[in-house]
Amino acid sequence: MPGIVTTNALNSGIYVRGGNSNENGFLINNMPIAYPDHLTGILSTFDPYILNNSTLFKSGFPARYNSFLSSYINMRPEPGNKHEHEGELTLGLVSSALKARGPIIKNHTSFAASARTSYLQHISRLYNRSMDDKTNPNYMPEYSFSDITATIDSRLSDKWRMTAFGLFSLDHMKMKISEHVQYIFDWHTFSGNVNVSYTPNANEQWDFQFGGKNTYSEGDAFGSVPMGGGNRNYALLGQATYSRRLSDKLNLNSGAKFEYSRFETANKSDDSQNLLIKSSDKDFNLYELYLDINYQLNQNFSLNVGGNYQFYAGETREHSFSPRAKISYTVNKFTLWADYAKTVQYLSLYPYFTVKTPIDIWYPLAKGTQPATCHQYSIGINQEVGQLLSFYAGIFYKDMRNVKDFASDIQTEYSALSNRQIQGKGHAKGLEFDLTLNHHALYMRANYTLSESKRKFAEINNGKAFNPPYDVKHNVMINFSYQISPRLLLNTLWTFSSGVYTTFPKGMVIAQNITEFNDDRPILIPVYTDRYNYKLPNNHRLDASLDYKFGGKNLLFKLSVGAYNVYNQSNPSFVYFQAESADNLTKIIPKSKVMLPFIPYVSLRINW
């Protein structure tokens, strides 16, 4: 979609309208979950076999959504098949999956479940072994993931319904810079929730939800500046909502929420057992009330107004009220709309490196700080031309206050971060265009986003405004599909995005351990001054696939052949620095890691 970009394969997060990737809320049945952070972009982060229905809000947020500045993605699980069992098996070079759904109690209770795993680490190892240049190798990161997703849907009676959802994910990555320098990352998540709905009549509904989420990550660096540690975040959540249709023109939605969150960080100890020692623990309670009113003024105009109140109780206590408003005008197949929304956020993300990684540390408000706030204004139009063509254009502006970052004197350990959390301000603005053509066997979609994002902190870059590492000026996506025959489908996807800013050191300091003589290799320590002082090259790539369907009465097959990064574009995912010596001179050369070069794949999907 326009206004949404990704930066590199090492970062699975999305950046919405100039915001950071930690400013997006992911929800299942309106209940927040932990983001799994699967990398590469080859495989979807969430399994569409279970989560095949989602709604994205990047402006005009309903009042029930708060605590994230940029966007909300609400996904609704597949209820399963209450009449008969069905399954799916996928076997491929990159990944495999086993999926099933069917009745637990026929016509009453059903389930859907999925288990996926990847083999990318084996492809990486083969690639690394095949390299000819052993003196200056460019190793491909070894990455793997597995996840399990499950849901249960039960119709308890004509008025009562219960659903349950669970998602567990496990990821591992080893990134080898040289024979002596490597990074090892591990992270996993768990999310689960239960929803009970009561519908006394056709005009009103009650929902009661309970859930929890947990994330854990651990990182180690070997052969460079010693660094490593782990962090954990878990939360307990509950909410009750009430919806009522007061008339054909007026609808009301209201609710109350509660969240308890705890954050634990630990440093890697120096002993041989490689233990994690506790560094800091933080927690908070969040209480929330909201009200939404939807009113159809007449045949053409509709109005949505609402408000969200939150009370945050942690190291600091904060009250916030977030108003929302949206007005739409529709005539025939043309829609013009304008909206305003205030959002607040209490969490920030401390980066482990100069680029975002899945092991970055979530951290709540420090004492004496205020929640980040965003005031967003946007207008847009939608125009449909029959069943053939649709066009969208939009413009937005975001004014952000009390956005968070961290002082630059933390580099090597997961120490207490509260004293180094800093506040600043920023803005984002942009234009969005989207064009979709759907004509018989041909489908094409193209969108373009022009945007600018700025941040300003007194403690960073001498108080000068700067482009953050998620400022992507130009972003283009072109998707083309052609149904060659009833059995054969061609898919292509080309993406382009402007290079993002990263932090390059101004120099290096050589350090050496003079107390131990078993290793005389010096350690190079980078010296940083300004942040985000270098712009990486533009990113672009082409993905293509050809799907062939065949089968009989009981078994259906789909054979997929394709390639990721067809023309082998070297899009940098990670930048590092390496010393190269010649003629008694040593130069510090910037290097980059490509997460995924050209990778062909073949997979066979079997449905029954």
Question: Where do the language-model regions lie?
Answer:
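Outer membrane beta-barrel strand-and-loop segments of large Gram-negative receptors
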Residues: 235-239, 280-290, 366, 370, ...
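A beta-strand signature from Gram-negative outer-membrane beta-barrel systems
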Residues: 45-84, 88, 97-99
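Transmembrane beta-barrel wall of Gram-negative outer-membrane proteins
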Residues: 94-117, 133-172, 184-206, 244-250, ...
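Gram-negative outer-membrane beta-barrel transporters
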Residues: 299-300, 397-399, 421-506
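Periplasmic N-terminal accessory/gating domains of Gram-negative outer-membrane beta-barrel systems
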Residues: 1-61, 78
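Surface-exposed extracellular loop regions of Gram-negative outer-membrane beta-barrel proteins
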Residues: 216, 267, 315, 329, ...
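C-terminal beta-signal and adjacent terminal beta-strands/loops
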Residues: 487, 495-522, 537-543, 547-608
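Structural signature of Gram-negative outer-membrane beta-barrels, strongest in the C-terminal barrel
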Residues: 157, 165-167, 247-253, 257, ...
